[in-house]
Amino acid sequence: MAYSCAYWPEGTTADLAAAQRAKLDLICAKLRLRPGDRLLDVGCGWGSLACHAARHHGARVTAVTVSGQQHAFVAARIAAEGLDELVDLRLQDYRDPVGGGYDAVAAVEMGEHVGAAEYPAFAARLRDLVRPGGRVLVQQISRGAHRPGGGAFIEAYIAPDMHMRPLGATVSLLEDAGLEVRGVEAMREHYGRTIRHWLARLEAQWPAAVGLIGLERARIWRLYLAGGAQVFEDGRMGVDQILAVRPGVGAQ
């Protein structure tokens, strides 16, 4: 289970699950994960990256989340997949002690929830957690310089803590923190496609969704997904993978 943008390699017509796996493969490839590498997954969500990196790349993963519900879900998933020796799951804030010297650090659609005032400290924390020469990948939603971020609807009903900025502003903040940005991949079209898949699944399971969260809440999510797909398709919002390294010995 994943709640972030999937990825369809050019020319593919894969289903959503395969596209999510392709996104995870893309992240792991950019981070150049090798067996035994230490990966920190900041805001690990439902555990898809942590489990994928451990199972398919042999990474030793530390995954952190502040959500008790996500922690319980991921813990069960780790046990079911037999990954207890490779994934260290922690219920904590990324600012709390979590070790250091990681070969790679990933933050997948977590930075939007940090807040404008806290983002410089967030970027500095990413730099401090990765070893010199290590890689950092930030996947994050962006907006145009003169366009609103989440907007009143999202802030009221979906994600009151969401803050988005232009891509260039995020790159500057990462560079100001001492990271060297090596590459950016824009994935806007992929998010429109991802959300259309989510909306189709919601419609297909509409009675179950209403039974689970009630009619009003289900309608809010239907409107959110329909509008969200449209703003990505229209280019009013984007999503980008930003790859950076901490300068030092071993940087490539």
Language-model features, listed with the residues they occupy:
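A short glycine-rich, Lys/Arg-flanked "PGG" loop and its adjoining helix->strand segment in the class I
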Residues: 120-132
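Conserved SAM-binding strand-loop segment of SAM-dependent methyltransferases
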Residues: 81-94
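Conserved Class I S-adenosyl-L-methionine-dependent methyltransferase catalytic core
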Residues: 1-30
